[in-house]
């Protein structure tokens, strides 16, 4: 399928897009993560971007994509409520991997948001969704627009949650192509990649955190908990960036 044909997929209804992409995804499932990135760079339109929350396994996709496409813009949506260890991890990986980091934030500061709306994350699912819209979704939409992105790489994996269990390698979202090169990797493959390339997990991994987001909606894993329960009080798994 030519690049022009792929562009035309964006004009189709969602169901038709999924059906049209099914054959391509069947082929992509047989490729390695590195081959998927190379295929996308050859067959999908630029500009290209990579998003990262700089979470537990973030070093994998940051290293993998940046090795193949040096200087690719790396989008971080900073809520202002990340753990101190996350900000330190961002600095460490940006320096080590020479990342072209692009930080986007909400138009309202965290203090201003609390003054206007209260602590949205304490206001149930509706409050959490509003918080995510302000601090994650709008900044990401702005980033994609300002960077003129047409192809978006992300480091999601099916093993991470039920909401990600059936995601394809290639899809369309927010009017761009979205590529998930390590979507089928398990925890062992992640560990092996980190070891092979001298990379580290997020610092909070050693303290029992399986997933890391904002300080107020992230919980340390305890025996008997599902990974989904460590984020957003178990009410949600996704922050909104990878939905829709």
Swiss-Prot record:
<dbReference type="GO" id="GO:0004604">
    <property type="term" value="F:phosphoadenylyl-sulfate reductase (thioredoxin) activity"/>
</dbReference>
<comment type="similarity">
    <text>Belongs to the PAPS reductase family. CysH subfamily.</text>
</comment>
<dbReference type="InterPro" id="IPR014729">
    <property type="entry name" value="Rossmann-like_a/b/a_fold"/>
</dbReference>
<keyword id="KW-0963">Cytoplasm</keyword>
<dbReference type="GO" id="GO:0070814">
    <property type="term" value="P:hydrogen sulfide biosynthetic process"/>
</dbReference>
<dbReference type="GO" id="GO:0019379">
    <property type="term" value="P:sulfate assimilation, phosphoadenylyl sulfate reduction by phosphoadenylyl-sulfate reductase (thioredoxin)"/>
</dbReference>
<feature type="active site" description="Nucleophile; cysteine thiosulfonate intermediate">
    <location>
        <position position="239"/>
    </location>
</feature>
<protein>
    <recommendedName>
        <fullName>Phosphoadenosine 5'-phosphosulfate reductase</fullName>
        <ecNumber>1.8.4.8</ecNumber>
    </recommendedName>
</protein>
<dbReference type="GO" id="GO:0005737">
    <property type="term" value="C:cytoplasm"/>
</dbReference>
<dbReference type="InterPro" id="IPR011800">
    <property type="entry name" value="PAPS_reductase_CysH"/>
</dbReference>
<dbReference type="Pfam" id="PF01507">
    <property type="entry name" value="PAPS_reduct"/>
</dbReference>
<dbReference type="InterPro" id="IPR004511">
    <property type="entry name" value="PAPS/APS_Rdtase"/>
</dbReference>
<comment type="function">
    <text>Catalyzes the formation of sulfite from phosphoadenosine 5'-phosphosulfate (PAPS) using thioredoxin as an electron donor.</text>
</comment>
<dbReference type="InterPro" id="IPR002500">
    <property type="entry name" value="PAPS_reduct_dom"/>
</dbReference>
<comment type="pathway">
    <text>Sulfur metabolism; hydrogen sulfide biosynthesis; sulfite from sulfate: step 3/3.</text>
</comment>
<keyword id="KW-0560">Oxidoreductase</keyword>
């Amino acid at each position: 399928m030519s690049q022009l044909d792929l562009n035309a997929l964006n004009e189709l209804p969602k169901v038709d897009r999924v059906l049209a992409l099914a054959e391509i995804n069947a082929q992509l499932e047989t490729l390695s993560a590195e081959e998927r990135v190379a295929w996308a760079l050859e067959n999908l339109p630029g500009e290209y971007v990579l998003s990262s929350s700089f979470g537990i396994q973030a070093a994998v996709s940051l290293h993998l994509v940046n090795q193949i496409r040096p200087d690719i813009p790396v989008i971080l949506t900073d809520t202002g409520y990340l753990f101190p260890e996350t900000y330190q991890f961002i600095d460490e990986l940006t320096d080590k991997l020479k990342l072209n980091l692009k930080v986007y934030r909400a138009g309202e500061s965290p203090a201003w948001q609390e003054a206007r709306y209260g602590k949205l994350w304490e206001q149930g699912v509706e409050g959490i969704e509003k918080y995510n819209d302000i601090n994650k979704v709008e900044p990401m939409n702005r980033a994609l627009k300002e960077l003129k992105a047409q192809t978006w790489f992300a480091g999601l994996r099916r093993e991470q949650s039920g909401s990600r269990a059936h995601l394809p390698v290639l899809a369309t979202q927010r009017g761009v192509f979205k590529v998930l090169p390590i979507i089928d990797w398990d925890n062992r493959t992640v560990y092996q990649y980190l070891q092979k390339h001298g990379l580290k997990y997020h610092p909070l991994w050693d303290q029992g955190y399986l997933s890391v987001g904002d300080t107020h909606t992230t919980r340390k894993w305890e025996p008997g908990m599902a990974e989904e329960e460590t984020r957003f009080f178990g009410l949600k798994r996704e922050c909104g960036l990878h939905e829709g």
